Amino acid sequence: NPGWDDFWIELQVRLEYLKKLTRDHFREWVESIEVSKVKPVLDLPDTASFITFNYTPTLEYVYGVRPDRILHIHGCVLDKNQLLQFGSPDNNPFELQKMLEEKYGMDDFYGATIQQGVTVACDRCADAWKNIEGNYDALNHFLDSLAKIDTVIIMGNSFDKVDKPYYRDVLAPRYRDAEWVFCEYESNEDKQYD
């Protein structure tokens, strides 16, 4: 029927900018960050390993850390084929799909028009989703490759809601007997690390 596709086509056109923003433009911006001119300010041990939430090759280029000692948990611009994970864990496309299907799934027009709109909305939601639990396998694989860890040093991480699950679900249980050192750029005495 003519016009039945208008809804989801319009939705796709209006939301297409999200894909360009979170994939193309974000990568272009990160690639434009000039790390080769950065001077090292830390003396990092050769035996140290790193989990970085930074998309840039700062550890590799500025500090000479071997790539096998680094896990770029959300991707690195050095790998042109790797998707840089940009967004929030709150943008879960599977939860959105479930909610929309529960709300509109019984509608007479669901199969004819609404379902395609749900698919478009969920695809764009995925473009702005940081799948934290989906990164656990890579994180555990990296950690399994390391020697015994006696000290965990946290630098430059805000411990916000986005990254908290990594600590709660993987790092804290695994390294509960290690010494934990927290380095903050600006002290925030009100902050609590649960």
Predicted segments, located by residue:
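Intrinsically disordered regions, especially transient/low-confidence alpha-helical propensity segments
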Residues: 1-5, 26, 126, 133, ...
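Active-site periphery "cap/insert" segments of enzyme catalytic domains
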Residues: 1-80, 140-155, 161-172, 182-183
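A two-mode feature
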Residues: 66-68, 91, 98-99
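Short, surface-exposed linear patches
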Residues: 71-74, 93-96, 174-177
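Short, flexible loop segments at boundaries between secondary-structure elements
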Residues: 78-80, 177-193
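Short conserved micro-motifs at the rims of enzyme active sites and ligand-binding pockets
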Residues: 82-85, 165-166, 192-193
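Short, surface-exposed amphipathic charged segments that create phosphate/polyanion-binding patches used
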Residues: 83-93
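Acidic, metal/cofactor-coordinating or nucleic-acid-engaging core segments within structured domains
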Residues: 95-147
